[in-house]
Structures are given as structure tokens and as C-alpha cells.
Swiss-Prot record:
Taxonomic lineage of the native organism: Bacteria, Pseudomonadati, Pseudomonadota, Gammaproteobacteria, Lysobacterales
InterPro entries: AAA+_ATPase, AAA_lid_4, DNA_helicase_Holl-junc_RuvB, P-loop_NTPase, RuvB-like_N, RuvB_C, WH-like_DNA-bd_sf, WH_DNA-bd_sf
Top-level division of the source organism's lineage: Bacteria
Residues annotated to bind ATP: 22-23, 64, 67-69, 130-132, 173, 183, 220
Protein's GO biological process: DNA recombination; DNA repair
Gene from which this protein is expressed: ruvB
GO cellular component: cytoplasm; Holliday junction resolvase complex
Keywords: ATP-binding, Cytoplasm, DNA damage, DNA recombination, DNA repair, DNA-binding, Hydrolase, Nucleotide-binding
Chain segments carrying region Small ATPAse domain (RuvB-S): 184-254
SUPFAM superfamilies, per the entry: P-loop containing nucleoside triphosphate hydrolases, Winged helix' DNA-binding domain
Region ranges (Disordered): 1-20
Protein name in the entry: Holliday junction branch migration complex subunit RuvB
Organism: Xanthomonas campestris pv. campestris (strain B100)
Compositionally skewed regions (Polar residues) per UniProt: 1-11
Catalytic activity: ATP + H2O = ADP + phosphate + H(+)
Length: 346
């Protein structure tokens, strides 16, 4: 079982509390994701000009990139209320009906982890999204009857880290689909500088850049690292964060210049030492690391693959020469990964 990692992209209670104070309210303050921002600005302005509810939005991408934040920004820009829930919380059709019937015209309903909705709940959601109506069963047995309830026009924003698990009927009902990408170090530096200013942290630009480049392209991780470096600086550097202080704090946290922690390095080294660099199946790798398959696929692998340290081939996972060099090893000539091989999630 994985302990809470400093560079984990999943949200902690501390993250949720801190995010509330630094979360941008407007698109102008939402840094990065420029193509998404440009498109959403047009959709929002068009909906406001027509006086209509904006079309339903599906936002997907790795954890920590700002899906929830973007939903808040959209609601603020539209000038409407936002209701927040998640797929696992909506257990029964009645739970969803209660949420929908309490919405005001043009409100935004945000459902996180929407891929985890049950089939029964999804069936209620379809007519709600298409026709702004829901069918409710009243009574039991032979006396049961269905009544149709009209809903005010609303915008559903669904967020997921696993878009492939969405059913086709649900996915097809979203008129706007946006994918959030990992952030560049430059974009994350701007985010760290902004967060430091809001939180009253004394942080130099080079200190912010050092935090940003180790944040795995993820704002949530960047803000968490900023808080940990702030703790270090308060004890060791009179509260001042510069390049040297940031580097010393990262060394204490065991987060290397690539943004990898012990679990990342252990995964790469396990593939090298136990499986001769790969290929290795995900189940074998998960067993060797004593981790769940989902943890590898959703938490560890995406960034390693995106940075070119790991590839998925038809035969399994393989490390690249870049991974050997990062571990201080010489890449074997006969183990160069076959980049041209087709990818395989399994």
C-alpha cells in the first residue's frame, strides 16, 4: 500500500483547504492550458449572449491539473451557482434527482469522477442532459407509476482521470470535451509565484522555478511542494526561499531534479534489476512493487511515460536509455527500446 507521497497528484485534506484560498476565480487568473482557456472563453461568452445554459462539458486528464478549479472558474464567469459532487457519492437515482431538482436556471452541476456513476444513475442522467427532464418512479409493485419532472436548463461538468471508462452514451451527451495537459516548468513557475504572493511567502523567482521544475507538470504538486519548502525555510532560512533553500528542501524531501521520488525510482530500478529492463507485464510489475495495478497506471506511469523514461509496448513496460542514465547506469546496447512498437495498456 502506497503511503501519501509528497509528489502524489491525488488531493489530500490539506490540499483541499489550501486550494480554496489560492484557487483562481476568473479565466484571466487561470494560468496555463491556453487552448482550453481560449475555447472556454468563447463558449462562455456565447452562452451569456444568448441567455442560455452553456452546453455540457467533459474535462479529462491526469489528477491535479485543475479540473475542479476550471469548473469553479466556469461557474464564476457564467455568474451562476456551482453544485459540487462526485460519482461515488451518487449511489441511487433518487440522490441524483434531489441534486437536479434543486438547481436554479443555468446553474452548473460538477460531478467529479463521473466515470464511477452506476448504470442506474446514468439512465436518469441521460434525459436530464438531453431534455432537461427526469422520470421518477412513484410507488411499488403493480401500483408503481412513472412521473416526468421538468428541470431548469443547467450545465453539467463531468471530470474524470479515466475517460476511457466512460460509457459511449454518456460521453456522447457532452457537447464540449476538454483535455487538460501537463504544465510546462514556465507555467508552473508563474503558478508558484502567484501562490506564494497570495500566501505571503517570501520566494524568489529562481526559488519558484526550482520548485516548479520538480512538480511533475502538476499545479497541485507545485503548490504542495511550495508549502513544504515554506516549512523548511521557516526553520532553516528565516522564511526566505531562494534557489539554494529550495534545493536543500527538495533533498530533504527526496524529490530529485526530475520530480521523481523513491517510488518512481524504485519502479524504474525494479524493471532494470528484476526484469532486465523489460518488457514486463503490469500485473507482474505491480506484484513486484507490492502496489495495485491502478496505482501504477493512474499515478506513477503517466509522468514517467510523458518524460520519456518508460514506454508501453505490445509485450509490456520497458525502461528507456534515459531511465538507465537517470539511475546512474549505462544503457545496454542490445536493450534499446523499440519505440516503433504499438502501445498497449495491458
Amino acid at each position: 500500500m502506497t503511503e501519501q507521497r509528497t509528489i502524489a497528484s491525488s488531493a489530500t485534506r490539506e490540499d483541499e483547504a489550501a486550494d480554496a484560498s489560492i484557487r483562481p476565480k476568473r479565466l484571466a487568473d487561470y494560468l496555463g492550458q491556453q487552448p482550453v482557456r481560449d475555447q472556454m472563453e468563447i463558449y462562455i461568452q456565447a452562452a451569456k449572449a444568448r441567455g442560455e445554459a452553456m452546453d455540457h462539458v467533459l474535462i479529462f486528464g491526469p489528477p491535479g491539473l485543475g479540473k475542479t478549479t476550471l469548473s469553479h472558474v466556469i461557474a464564476n464567469e457564467l455568474g451562476v451557482s456551482l453544485r459540487v459532487t462526485s460519482g461515488p457519492v451518487i449511489e441511487k437515482a433518487g440522490d441524483l434527482a434531489a441534486l437536479l431538482t434543486n438547481l436554479q436556471p443555468h446553474d452548473v452541476l460538477f460531478i467529479d469522477e463521473i466515470h464511477r456513476l452506476s448504470p442506474v444513475v446514468e439512465e436518469v442522467l441521460y434525459p436530464a442532459m438531453e431534455d432537461f427532464q427526469i422520470d421518477i418512479m412513484i410507488g411499488d409493485g403493480p401500483a408503481a407509476r412513472s412521473i416526468k419532472i421538468d428541470l431548469p436548463p443547467f450545465t453539467l461538468i463531468g471530470a474524470t482521470t479515466r475517460a476511457g471508462l466512460l460509457t459511449a452514451p454518456l460521453r456522447d451527451r457532452f457537447g464540449i470535451v476538454q483535455r487538460l495537459e501537463f504544465y510546462s516548468p514556465q507555467e508552473l513557475t508563474r503558478i508558484v509565484i502567484r501562490s506564494a504572493a497570495i500566501l505571503g511567502i517570501d520566494c524568489t523567482p529562481d526559488g519558484a522555478a526550482e520548485i516548479a521544475r520538480r512538480a511533475r507538470g502538476t499545479p497541485r504538486i507545485a503548490n504542495r511542494l511550495l508549502r513544504r519548502v515554506r516549512d523548511f525555510a521557516q526553520v532553516k532560512a528565516a522564511g526566505h526561499i531562494d534557489l539554494a533553500v529550495a534545493q536543500a528542501a527538495m533533498q530533504m524531501l527526496k524529490v530529485d531534479p526530475e520530480g521523481f521520488d523513491e517510488l518512481d525510482r524504485r519502479m524504474l530500478r525494479t524493471i532494470v534489476d528484476h526484469f532486465d529492463g523489460g518488457p514486463v507485464g503490469v500485473e507482474s510489475l505491480a506484484a513486484s512493487l507490492s502496489e495495485e495495478r491502478g496505482t501504477l497506471e493512474d499515478v506513477i506511469e503517466p509522468y514517467l511515460i510523458q518524460q520519456g523514461f518508460l514506454i508501453r509496448t505490445a509485450r509490456g513496460r520497458m525502461v528507456t536509455p534515459k531511465a538507465y542514465l537517470h539511475l546512474g547506469l549505462k544503457p545496454p546496447r542490445d536493450r534499446a527500446p523499440a519505440i516503433g512498437e504499438p502501445g498497449d495498456l495491458f
